[in-house]
Protein backbone atom coordinates (compact mmCIF):
# COMPACT_ATOMS: atom_id res chain seq x y z
CA UNK A 1 0.00 0.00 0.00
CA UNK A 2 2.84 2.41 0.79
CA UNK A 3 4.23 1.83 -2.70
CA UNK A 4 0.99 3.11 -4.23
CA UNK A 5 1.17 6.21 -2.04
CA UNK A 6 4.78 6.76 -3.10
CA UNK A 7 3.77 6.36 -6.74
CA UNK A 8 0.95 8.89 -6.25
CA UNK A 9 3.36 11.43 -4.73
CA UNK A 10 5.74 10.91 -7.63
CA UNK A 11 3.02 11.33 -10.23
CA UNK A 12 1.85 14.58 -8.65
CA UNK A 13 5.26 16.19 -9.29
CA UNK A 14 5.32 15.64 -13.04
CA UNK A 15 4.98 18.49 -15.57
CA UNK A 16 5.18 18.98 -19.34
CA UNK A 17 6.77 15.71 -20.39
CA UNK A 18 7.01 16.73 -24.02
CA UNK A 19 9.90 19.11 -23.27
CA UNK A 20 12.33 16.55 -21.80
CA UNK A 21 13.43 14.77 -24.96
CA UNK A 22 15.03 15.84 -28.20
CA UNK A 23 16.29 19.31 -27.19
CA UNK A 24 17.20 19.97 -30.83
CA UNK A 25 13.45 20.10 -31.61
CA UNK A 26 13.09 23.08 -29.19
CA UNK A 27 9.46 22.29 -28.42
CA UNK A 28 9.08 24.71 -25.51
CA UNK A 29 10.27 27.70 -27.58
CA UNK A 30 8.11 26.75 -30.54
CA UNK A 31 5.07 26.25 -28.34
CA UNK A 32 5.70 29.60 -26.63
CA UNK A 33 5.74 31.31 -30.05
CA UNK A 34 2.51 29.58 -31.08
CA UNK A 35 0.86 30.50 -27.77
CA UNK A 36 1.85 34.15 -28.16
CA UNK A 37 0.20 34.15 -31.60
CA UNK A 38 -2.95 32.56 -30.14
CA UNK A 39 -3.17 34.72 -27.02
CA UNK A 40 -6.54 36.20 -27.98
CA UNK A 41 -8.23 32.89 -28.87
CA UNK A 42 -6.73 30.74 -26.10
CA UNK A 43 -5.90 32.66 -22.93
CA UNK A 44 -4.77 29.60 -20.92
CA UNK A 45 -2.31 28.35 -23.52
CA UNK A 46 0.83 28.41 -21.36
CA UNK A 47 -1.05 27.17 -18.28
CA UNK A 48 -2.08 24.06 -20.21
CA UNK A 49 1.55 22.93 -20.59
CA UNK A 50 1.63 21.32 -17.16
CA UNK A 51 0.73 17.65 -17.04
CA UNK A 52 0.76 17.24 -13.28
CA UNK A 53 -1.00 13.86 -13.17
CA UNK A 54 1.24 11.95 -15.56
CA UNK A 55 4.55 10.14 -15.65
CA UNK A 56 5.87 8.32 -18.69
CA UNK A 57 8.35 5.59 -19.42
CA UNK A 58 11.16 6.02 -21.93
CA UNK A 59 9.34 4.72 -25.02
CA UNK A 60 6.14 6.66 -24.32
CA UNK A 61 8.10 9.83 -23.65
CA UNK A 62 9.81 9.52 -27.02
CA UNK A 63 6.48 8.85 -28.80
CA UNK A 64 4.72 11.85 -27.25
CA UNK A 65 7.65 14.18 -27.91
CA UNK A 66 7.92 13.09 -31.54
CA UNK A 67 4.16 13.35 -32.07
CA UNK A 68 4.09 16.86 -30.56
CA UNK A 69 7.03 17.89 -32.74
CA UNK A 70 5.20 16.72 -35.86
CA UNK A 71 1.93 18.41 -34.91
CA UNK A 72 3.67 21.70 -34.14
CA UNK A 73 5.60 21.45 -37.41
CA UNK A 74 2.40 21.01 -39.42
CA UNK A 75 0.83 23.98 -37.63
CA UNK A 76 3.89 26.13 -38.33
CA UNK A 77 3.95 25.18 -42.01
CA UNK A 78 0.23 25.65 -42.58
CA UNK A 79 -0.04 28.68 -40.33
CA UNK A 80 -3.19 27.16 -38.86
CA UNK A 81 -3.08 27.47 -35.09
CA UNK A 82 -6.73 26.73 -34.35
CA UNK A 83 -6.16 23.01 -33.83
CA UNK A 84 -3.55 23.57 -31.09
CA UNK A 85 -6.09 23.66 -28.20
CA UNK A 86 -7.83 20.51 -29.43
CA UNK A 87 -4.50 18.69 -29.84
CA UNK A 88 -3.42 19.72 -26.35
CA UNK A 89 -6.74 18.57 -24.83
CA UNK A 90 -6.55 15.26 -26.71
CA UNK A 91 -2.99 14.80 -25.49
CA UNK A 92 -3.97 15.47 -21.88
CA UNK A 93 -7.32 13.66 -21.75
CA UNK A 94 -6.56 10.66 -23.94
CA UNK A 95 -2.99 9.91 -24.92
CA UNK A 96 -1.11 10.75 -21.72
CA UNK A 97 -3.57 8.77 -19.61
CA UNK A 98 -3.22 5.83 -21.98
CA UNK A 99 0.59 5.93 -21.97
CA UNK A 100 0.75 6.45 -18.21
CA UNK A 101 -1.45 3.41 -17.62
CA UNK A 102 0.48 1.40 -20.20
CA UNK A 103 3.75 2.20 -18.42
CA UNK A 104 2.50 1.09 -15.00
CA UNK A 105 0.40 -1.96 -15.95
CA UNK A 106 1.30 -5.46 -17.12
CA UNK A 107 2.52 -6.77 -19.51
CA UNK A 108 4.93 -3.86 -20.14
CA UNK A 109 5.58 -3.33 -16.42
CA UNK A 110 6.88 -6.21 -14.32
CA UNK A 111 7.61 -5.45 -10.68
CA UNK A 112 8.96 -1.95 -11.16
CA UNK A 113 9.73 0.44 -13.98
CA UNK A 114 11.51 3.72 -14.56
CA UNK A 115 9.23 6.70 -15.12
CA UNK A 116 10.41 10.20 -15.89
CA UNK A 117 9.65 13.22 -13.74
CA UNK A 118 9.34 15.82 -16.43
CA UNK A 119 9.82 18.86 -14.22
CA UNK A 120 13.40 17.65 -13.65
CA UNK A 121 13.60 15.22 -16.61
CA UNK A 122 15.06 12.58 -14.31
CA UNK A 123 14.02 8.96 -14.13
CA UNK A 124 12.85 7.30 -10.94
CA UNK A 125 12.03 3.69 -10.26
CA UNK A 126 8.42 3.12 -9.21
CA UNK A 127 6.46 -0.03 -8.51
CA UNK A 128 3.95 -1.25 -11.06
CA UNK A 129 0.26 -1.00 -10.33
CA UNK A 130 -1.48 -4.18 -9.15
CA UNK A 131 -3.38 -6.11 -11.79
CA UNK A 132 -6.74 -5.29 -10.17
CA UNK A 133 -6.09 -1.55 -10.55
CA UNK A 134 -5.02 -1.95 -14.16
CA UNK A 135 -7.84 -4.28 -15.15
CA UNK A 136 -10.76 -3.80 -12.77
CA UNK A 137 -13.31 -6.57 -13.04
CA UNK A 138 -10.83 -9.08 -14.40
CA UNK A 139 -9.91 -12.14 -12.38
CA UNK A 140 -6.39 -12.72 -11.24
CA UNK A 141 -4.68 -16.11 -11.22
CA UNK A 142 -5.71 -16.98 -7.66
CA UNK A 143 -9.39 -16.39 -8.40
CA UNK A 144 -9.08 -18.48 -11.57
CA UNK A 145 -7.60 -21.37 -9.57
CA UNK A 146 -10.43 -21.24 -7.05
CA UNK A 147 -13.00 -21.21 -9.84
CA UNK A 148 -11.31 -24.16 -11.58
CA UNK A 149 -11.18 -26.19 -8.34
CA UNK A 150 -14.85 -25.44 -7.68
CA UNK A 151 -15.87 -26.60 -11.17
CA UNK A 152 -13.76 -29.79 -10.88
CA UNK A 153 -15.14 -30.53 -7.41
CA UNK A 154 -18.70 -30.05 -8.63
CA UNK A 155 -18.07 -32.36 -11.59
CA UNK A 156 -16.70 -35.05 -9.25
CA UNK A 157 -19.59 -34.68 -6.83
CA UNK A 158 -22.10 -35.03 -9.66
CA UNK A 159 -20.11 -37.80 -11.34
CA UNK A 160 -19.95 -40.16 -8.35
CA UNK A 161 -23.76 -40.42 -7.84
CA UNK A 162 -24.23 -40.63 -11.60
CA UNK A 163 -21.82 -43.57 -11.74
CA UNK A 164 -23.55 -45.25 -8.79
CA UNK A 165 -26.95 -44.94 -10.47
CA UNK A 166 -25.68 -46.53 -13.68
Curated annotation (Swiss-Prot):
The main location is: membrane
Q: Which residues are glycosylated?
A: 117
Modifications after synthesis and translation: N-glycosylated.
Query: Which stretches are Cytoplasmic in the membrane topology?
Result: 166
Expressed in which tissues: Detected in testis and brain with higher levels in brain than testis.
Residues in the signal sequence: 1-16
Where in or outside the cell it occurs: the entry states:
Cytoplasmic vesicle, Secretory vesicle, Acrosome membrane
**What are the GO cellular component annotations?**
acrosomal membrane; acrosomal vesicle; sperm plasma membrane
Which Pfam families does the record associate with it?
Answer: TMEM95 (PF15203)
Membrane topology listed for this record: Single-pass type I membrane protein
Q: Which InterPro entries match?
A: TMEM95
Any single biological process term in GO: single fertilization
Q: Which residues lie on this side of the membrane: Extracellular?
A: 17-145
Taken from the UniProt record, the cysteine pairs bridged by disulfide bonds within this chain are: 17-118, 20-121, 105-128, 109-134
Highest taxon, organism lineage = Eukaryota
Q: Which UniProt keywords apply?
A: Cytoplasmic vesicle, Disulfide bond, Fertilization, Glycoprotein, Membrane, Signal, Transmembrane, Transmembrane helix
Transmembrane domains' residue ranges? 146-165
Q: To which protein family does this belong?
A: Belongs to the TMEM95 family.
**Quaternary data:** Does not interact with sperm-egg fusion proteins IZUMO1 or IZUMO1R/JUNO.
Q: What does this protein do?
A: Sperm protein required for fusion of sperm with the egg membrane during fertilization.
The name this protein goes by in its record = Sperm-egg fusion protein TMEM95
